[in-house]
Swiss-Prot record:
Main location: membrane
Protein name: Flagellar motor switch protein FliM
Keyword Heme: no
Organism: Buchnera aphidicola subsp. Baizongia pistaciae (strain Bp)
Entry's family note: Belongs to the FliM family.
Length: 331
């Protein structure tokens, strides 16, 4: 019964997919990116494991400070949401990814960078103010933070190039906040990024490290890797199976969450036009209530029920899912 109803709703969804997909499933436009990263999941997990070890090693080379970093999650979001989420409590930089001429973003919580500089190099003048966070950065502080970002990015993208046939060369720009990145480097607020987030603890300070890649580039990288792996039949066949299964599940999510309009015909009555024209205020029209009431969506029968009174309200009492093989008799 349920499967029959689900198939009916699927037909309704497919019929109106263009009109309702954005309302029903807000992440529909990023579905392909999630599929991409599912396919790259094992490669990315191995890459991040190596990256975390290398990052910890670099920190320990500077001092004996206790450092722990772990991969938190990745999210796909527009640049305006990145700015909204991390606001101005992070030091940020943007970098160019050559030869694709795409811009990425790296940021770290200011309490982490502040502590590192203070612990390793004797302090800094990093303070929040109404004039903006970066007005208080000294030249030495900027150089130190940029060096830290450079180490992080070089190691990260060295490993990224190992898991993807899409090779990247990083060109760091100047240290700045997210508003400056938006204005100076012409990142559109609607541009979409994959943000890899890492939990970071240095001594007793906790914060976040984030690396943002443009989704278009990330998607392109995985596509290039798949195309160049055409001789690996098992790899292609596995990816095809994974893609098919995930698309089925995603489509099921879309169908289960789609909003359909139910129309319920409570009565049936037949009358001639001459009688309708002859009606006067107060005239009574006898009606014949149906024994079985059907709830329709887009003229597709979905539910069978009864018309009843419940707590002084007229209600549709569900009896069963509609089954086209049964004959529902009406009175």
């Amino acid at each position: 019964m349920q499967s029959d109803v689900i198939s009916r709703v699927k037909k309704i969804y497919i019929k109106n997919k263009i009109d309702i997909s954005s309302k029903i499933f807000p992440y529909y436009q990023t579905t392909d990116y999630y599929l991409t990263y599912h396919n790259m999941k094992d490669r990315l997990e191995n890459m991040h494991e190596c990256f975390l070890k290398q990052f910890t090693k670099h920190i320990s080379e500077y001092s004996d400070v206790d450092c722990k970093i772990s991969f938190y999650k990745f999210i796909i979001q527009k640049f305006k949401n990145i700015k909204k989420n991390i606001k101005n409590n992070s030091i940020s930089d943007c970098f160019e990814i050559s030869p694709y001429k795409k811009l990425g973003i790296i940021f770290v919580s200011d309490n982490i960078s502040d502590y590192l500089i203070e612990y390793l190099f004797g302090g800094c003048e990093l303070k929040n103010s109404s004039n903006g966070l970066f007005k208080k950065l000294t030249l030495s502080t900027i150089n130190i933070v940029k060096k830290m970002f450079k180490i992080i990015l070089e190691q990260y993208y060295f490993l990224w190039n190992k898991v993807s046939l899409c090779k990247m060369k990083l060109i760091l720009n100047r240290l700045q906040n997210l508003n400056e990145i938006s204005n100076v480097n012409f990142i559109n607020s609607k541009d979409t990024f994959v943000t890899f987030l890492f939990r970071l603890r240095i001594a007793n300070k906790f914060g976040m490290l984030g690396i943002c890649l443009p989704t278009s580039l990330s998607f392109q990288c995985n596509n290039e890797a798949d195309v160049n792996s055409v001789h690996n039949v098992s790899h292609i066949s596995y990816d095809n199976v994974v893609n098919t299964e995930i698309r089925k599940r995603l489509f099921q999510v879309i169908v289960y969450n789609c909003k359909i309009v139910l129309k319920i015909v409570l009565i049936e009555n037949y009358i001639t036009l001459s009688k309708i024209i002859a009606f006067k205020v107060g005239d009574i029209l006898p009606i014949h209530m149906l024994d079985n009431v059907v709830a329709y969506s887009e003229n597709v029968p979905i539910l069978i029920g009864k018309y009843k009174m419940f707590k002084n309200k007229y209600v549709f009492c569900v009896v069963d899912y509609y089954n086209s093989t049964l004959n529902y008799k009406n009175g």
